[in-house]
């Protein structure tokens, strides 16, 4: 077909120009049939809707818009999460700071003693370590240097990681199979001390020196090397660069949580006085006082199931006051009736989650005393039976213990229910022993009981309980 043929278009008369406009900025060889994609020039009209070019150019823009929106939402959620985390951390820090203030509005006398201890530490009158025992415990002093309390930090307990006594460390290293007491919750001794004081106050026994959970910091406590280095670094920063040092929440050593028990004066180990009373018998009235105080110790130890009660960790105060108010011209003095009181200390190994059933039975050593063979008196029955026979009283006691025990960072609700089940069983046995006019010796020979809350699929306003007896005995049984 020649160029003059009517089938040839006039536009095709000239050879096609495959070069791009100079404004495009692209230079490609003029090859017929070459496919290239050219960016639209500024001011050029949009592609017709529905054309392939239009879809290809619009799709990335939509994807970018959606991606930007999703990224914005993610950043918003992350910012909200960070804000919530910051609020939670601030709330936790505020709660911790509130606890560390050691405020006891329900017991202003106890709070005043704690303030004296804090003031003494500020004046560099530090607590003094007690070298007896298997844990880190300290005599706390007032600004005048007098002993006012005994402090037992949580992390310095017999099985704590900062226990300064090497005996437990050696036992753990050489005999791990016999390390610890599997019937107890480890590192909860400070709560056990405070719990025993709570039970004592609820039952109005008045034999446990008031004990509560307190936070204290002292140079004489056993801290890790890291804590001491951090404390020295913060103090140095505060001295050298005050603007930086003032930003720290705490400058000194971190406070330790532990049990703070008021110190009792004039008491000696029960073993000392019991041996003396055996050699020098007491008058009848004085011996009666000792028996009534002894019964209170039995009630307390049995309810909390104290696994560490010997005759060397409860105290007796024997006071024989002399009345010298008579005339100085005479040599006569009037001797008043002696006064005997008992103090139950060292209650850190109580509230087990099961009755001892492995190697040792952890008996009550007071069960071998002659006072344990005497039936319970009417005075102790009148004091205790109305309380422990009332389900509402027992329930209130459980709730108070729950509020105390849940303060521990490692609190486990399941373990607490097991502890309460053991305590209910002890209360059940004690109630029956008091009603049957039994003696403390007969009480400890009763079979161990566990009273658990019955599980029911139906909701009920009242709780039901299941009672079970423990048949397994420890390898080294004492009865």
Curated annotation (Swiss-Prot):
Compositional bias, Basic and acidic residues, is annotated for 53-66
The record's listing under InterPro entries reads:
Lsb6/PI4K2 (IPR039756), PI3/4_kinase_cat_dom (IPR000403)
Q: Which UniProt keywords apply?
A: Acetylation, ATP-binding, Cell membrane, Cell projection, Cytoplasmic vesicle, Disease variant, Endosome, Epilepsy, Golgi apparatus, Intellectual disability, Kinase, Lipid metabolism, Lipoprotein, Membrane, Mitochondrion, Nucleotide-binding, Palmitate, Phosphoprotein, Synapse, Synaptosome, Transferase, Ubl conjugation
Cellular component GO terms, alphabetical: cytoplasmic vesicle; cytosol; dendrite; early endosome membrane; endosome; endosome membrane; glutamatergic synapse; Golgi membrane
Where are the annotated segments for Important for substrate binding? 157-159
Catalytic activity reported: a 1,2-diacyl-sn-glycero-3-phospho-(1D-myo-inositol) + ATP = a 1,2-diacyl-sn-glycero-3-phospho-(1D-myo-inositol 4-phosphate) + ADP + H(+)
Q: Which residues carry this modification: Phosphoserine?
A: 5, 9, 44, 47, 51, 462
**Where is this protein found?**
Golgi apparatus, trans-Golgi network membrane; Membrane raft; Cell projection, Dendrite; Presynaptic cell membrane
Disease implicated = Neurodevelopmental disorder with hyperkinetic movements, seizures, and structural brain abnormalities: An autosomal recessive disorder characterized by failure to thrive, global developmental delay with intellectual disability and absent speech, seizures, hypotonia, inability to walk, orofacial dyskinesia, involuntary movements, and structural brain abnormalities.
Q: What is this protein called?
A: Phosphatidylinositol 4-kinase type 2-alpha
Taxonomic lineage: Eukaryota, Metazoa, Chordata, Craniata, Vertebrata
User: What is the gene called?
Assistant: PI4K2A
